Amino acid sequence: MAGLHGPELLERYNRSLMGVFGTPQRVLVRGSGCTVWDADGKEYLDLLAGIAVNALGHAHPFVTSVVSSQLATLGHVSNFFTSPTQIALAERLLALSGAPAGSRVFFANSGAEANEAAFKLARRNSAPGAGGKPRTRIVALENAFHGRTMGALALTWKAAYREPFEPLPGGVEWVAAGDADALRAAVDETVAAVFIEPVQGEAGVRGHPEGYLRAAREITRDAGALLVFDEVQTGVGRTGSWFASEGVLPDAMTLAKGLGGGFPIGALIAFGEDVSTLLAAGQHGTTFGGNPVATAAALATLHTIESQGLLEHARRAGAAVAAALGALDFVTGVRAHGLLIGFDLAAEIAPAVVRHALDAGFIVNATGPGTVRLAPPLIVTEGQLLGFVDALPAIYAAATSEETP
């Protein structure tokens, strides 16, 4: 592959890969820490971390060594067998989440797969309530994003994502995000589960009012519905805590993205014996989920986050960049949850800002016409973040000029 450049590789990409992502912005060939390089030798500061995946940056030496060692020892065993790393990771996640006795973990390969498992878990909560009516409804939130596989897509709010693939699994309805009264009005004994992202990343990094998650816990408990937190984007330290659930224990929680430090893995944690036994033997499964290499990578990632104090660092660095962004006159709003940050622009030119940021050597993304998201590796320095803020006025000016007729 030596000597090949971006345009040639992108031409080959367009001839050989499905166009579901459009044409990639660059061909990346190498990464180290928070920096990546493209096929033409240009260097970029990665402030997106593969969409909140590379929690420890690129080619982290400890994760790399653990994965290499595990792959050289035992790579895959199927679901007929288990491995020490799979068991150890399940135990670690149960401990970190404060899981009560009887809680259990199911491993998958992605966030969408974890949410598919949670959807099936919810369907199993079908026993009629006191009034004798079957539990056929599932409630999700407006602006929610839970994935693009069929069950996860059925939970996702945006009609443009869903409509080309209808009919989807039925019985899903949406209520206004952050509105406890709307949730209370919607949830009764016919509801099997309520799905909530503690912070809606794809909606522009939007959290909920204080007390909302606790109210959701009370509402679902009273109705006999499961409360499922989708922490695919927010979990594993992204927001400066292991989880973004504000101390509220749901009935189930999904994880992925940063869990493997760049290696594909997802997880569903079911809390308590009653919930963890809803899915019986043979009712769900996966070939690759929880394989020795992925679980070893996740254990190494969790160890590094804890041993290097990255939860506190995420809180501190996130607050610093949020304050700096808020001081810019063209930034009209900032929402920072640790190192998951969304900021709004005075003009709806976020896609152009993203393009010019890339030209300037920064990887960020737009979650809407006027909102830019940052989700850098948890090892990013305040200096690197503030360097982006320093460059942002020129980037914004270039984007404004592009959008001006």
Question: Across the structure, where does each feature detected by a protein language model lie?
Answer:
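Conserved N-terminal phosphate-binding loop of PLP-dependent enzymes in the Aspartate aminotransferase
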Residues: 1-405
